[in-house]
C-alpha cells in the first residue's frame, strides 16, 4: 500500500516584481548540441544569475531553457504595517494544497488587491528600475561574452558555416502578489511562488516574440519605475489576456542587439573611432537615474531610436487606440520604414504587429472597439 505524503507547509502572501526569461530556439539547439547542451545552458545561466543578483534580484527557478526571477518587495503584513493600512491585520496563511483554501486565497487576494499601492513603498521605484537594468545588462552580455559569442561559429549550429547562430532570449516583467511557500512532497520540495501575476510575467515573455522585441513589461511594472525609467520605455499596445477582462498596457525598452559592445577592459583609443559612447560602466550602487543616463550598456542598446521614429510610432499608436486606423496606418508604416534604415533591423516589430492586426480587420476598427485587444498568443 502506498501512502501519499504531501507537504503541509503554509504559504504567505507577498508582493514582488516577477521576471521570466527564455532561451529562443532551444529545442533545435538541444537536438544539435546533444550532451553539450548542459554547457550551453549553464553558460547562459551564469550570465542571467550574475546580473539578476547584482541588480538586487533572485533567481528562483531554473527550468531548462527558462528562468523565473524575483525582485522581492515584501510580505503583505510588513507592507500593510509600513503603509499604515492595517497594522493589526495578521498575515494571511494559506494551507496547501487544499482546494477550498485555494478558493479562499483567491477571494482574499481579490479583496485585498486594492489595499496595497506598491507605488507608495519606499525604494520600489529604484527596485523596478534595477529589474529592467538587469535585463538590459543580460542582453548586452549575451552579445559580448566570448564564451557565448563562440556559439556563433559553432558548425553544429551554423550548418557548417552557412549562417551565423546568435543566442537570443525573451524577457517579461510584471508586478503583483503571489503566495510564497513550499510545493511538493516529502520526497521533493521546492520553494516557489504561485499567482496569476507570475503567469503574467511568463505570458509577457512569450508575447515578446509576437511584437519582435526582446523585452515586454506590463503597466503594473511600468507604474513602479522612476520617471526617468518610464521615459526610456516605449508603450506598444493595450491588451487583455486569457482569463482577465482588465485592459493592461505593455511596454518595451528598445534594445538593438546586433552590434559590437565594449567591455570594461576595452582599450579606449581603439574603440573611440567606432563607438562614440563613453565607456562608463555603472554598478547597482549607482543611482538608477544616472545608470539610464550615463551607463554605456544602457545607452548603447537604444542608440538607434530617433525622435522622428518615436514621434511616428507614438502618433500611430494613439490613433490606433482611438480607433482611427486608416490614419494610424500611415504613421506606423513611417515608423517601420525609419527603423528599417537601421543596420541589421528589418523594420519595427511592434509597428508591424499593429499593422498586421489592423490589416486583418480591413483597416477599420470594429464597432465594439474600446481601445484594447485580446492578446491572441500565450
Predicted regions and their residues:
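Generic non-transmembrane alpha-helical segments
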Residues: 40-55, 134-145
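Catalytic core of nucleotidyl cyclases, primarily class III adenylyl/guanylyl cyclases
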Residues: 20-21, 55-130, 140-196, 220-231, ...
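Intrinsically disordered, glycine/charged-rich C-terminal tails and inter-domain linkers
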Residues: 93-108, 163, 168-169, 177-180, ...
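Regulatory cytosolic signal-relay segments
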Residues: 1-14, 50, 92-111, 122, ...
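Nucleotide second-messenger and two-component phosphorelay signaling modules
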Residues: 7-13, 32-35, 50-57, 159-162, ...
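Catalytic-site or vestigial catalytic-site microsegments of nucleotide-handling domains
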Residues: 15-28, 74
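Conserved long alpha-helical elements within nucleotide-processing catalytic cores of c-di-GMP signaling
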Residues: 27-49, 60-61
Amino acid at each position: 500500500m502506498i501512502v501519499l505524503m504531501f507537504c503541509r507547509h503554509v504559504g504567505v502572501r507577498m508582493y514582488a516584481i516577477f521576471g521570466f526569461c527564455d532561451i529562443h530556439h532551444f529545442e533545435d539547439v538541444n537536438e544539435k548540441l546533444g550532451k553539450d547542451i548542459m554547457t550551453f545552458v549553464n553558460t547562459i545561466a551564469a550570465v542571467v544569475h550574475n546580473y539578476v543578483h547584482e541588480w538586487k534580484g533572485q533567481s528562483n527557478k531554473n527550468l531548462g531553457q527558462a528562468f523565473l526571477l524575483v525582485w522581492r518587495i515584501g510580505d503583505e503584513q510588513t507592507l500593510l504595517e509600513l503603509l499604515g493600512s492595517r497594522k493589526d491585520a495578521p498575515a494571511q496563511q494559506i494551507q496547501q494544497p487544499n482546494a477550498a483554501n485555494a478558493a479562499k486565497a483567491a477571494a482574499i487576494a481579490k479583496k485585498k488587491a486594492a489595499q496595497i499601492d506598491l507605488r507608495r513603498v519606499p525604494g520600489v521605484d529604484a527596485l523596478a528600475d534595477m529589474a529592467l537594468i538587469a535585463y538590459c545588462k543580460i542582453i548586452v552580455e549575451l552579445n559580448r561574452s566570448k564564451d557565448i559569442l563562440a556559439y556563433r561559429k559553432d558548425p553544429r549550429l551554423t550548418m557548417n558555416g552557412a549562417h551565423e547562430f546568435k543566442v537570443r532570449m525573451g524577457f517579461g516583467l510584471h508586478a503583483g502578489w503571489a503566495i510564497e511557500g513550499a510545493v511538493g512532497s516529502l520526497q521533493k520540495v521546492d520553494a516557489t511562488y504561485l499567482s496569476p501575476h507570475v503567469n503574467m510575467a511568463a505570458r509577457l515573455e512569450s508575447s515578446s516574440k509576437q511584437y519582435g522585441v526582446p523585452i515586454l513589461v506590463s503597466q503594473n511594472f511600468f507604474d513602479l519605475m522612476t520617471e526617468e525609467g518610464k521615459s526610456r520605455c516605449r508603450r506598444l499596445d493595450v491588451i487583455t489576456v486569457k482569463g482577465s477582462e482588465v485592459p493592461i498596457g505593455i511596454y518595451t525598452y528598445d534594445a538593438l542587439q546586433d552590434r559590437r559592445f565594449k567591455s570594461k577592459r576595452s582599450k579606449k583609443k581603439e574603440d573611440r573611432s567606432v563607438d562614440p559612447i563613453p565607456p562608463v560602466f555603472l554598478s547597482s550602487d549607482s543611482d538608477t537615474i544616472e545608470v539610464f543616463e550615463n551607463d554605456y550598456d544602457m545607452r548603447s542598446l537604444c542608440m538607434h531610436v530617433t525622435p522622428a521614429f518615436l514621434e511616428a510610432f507614438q502618433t500611430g499608436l494613439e490613433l490606433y487606440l482611438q480607433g482611427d486606423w486608416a490614419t494610424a496606418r500611415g504613421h506606423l508604416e513611417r515608423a517601420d520604414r525609419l527603423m528599417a534604415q537601421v543596420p541589421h533591423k528589418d523594420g519595427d516589430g511592434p509597428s508591424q504587429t499593429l499593422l498586421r492586426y489592423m490589416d486583418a480587420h480591413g483597416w477599420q476598427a470594429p464597432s465594439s472597439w474600446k481601445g484594447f485587444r485580446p492578446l491572441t498568443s500565450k
